[in-house]
Amino acid sequence: MSKTTALSNAFITVWYHSDQKIVHHQIHKYICGSPLREANNVGTELLRQHGACKWLSDDRNAGPLPPEDLQWAHDVFTPSAVKAGWKYWALVLPEKAVAQMNMKRFQAEFAQAGVTVQTFSDPEAGMTWLESL
């Protein structure tokens, strides 16, 4: 599988798997604000540029999001990503229970917007599911 790094910093790495047309990110440590928004915007642009519709989120190291990031995700990220073509989301859930609550909210929001969401405990299982679609 051909994997290209689109963004890499101390908080997060975003890749694009060209053979399977999958956007993939891995959170390395707590992320919020500008770095989070930049990563989500990079992923959305990858969906748009490549006509991709699958995203693997490895959010095991994610923490709870502040209200302003939750609002930004609702107002900006969700509609933009769906418009860019996002249809399938493999979500590796955060280890922290409080962060899982944020993800459950996002799951419901994206499902309502037409994105099929499956949750996983490891990224390999999520990738396998996306590759099967």
Residue map of PLM features:
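Amphipathic, Lys/Arg-enriched alpha-helical "gate/interface" segment within cytosolic domains
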Residues: 2-133
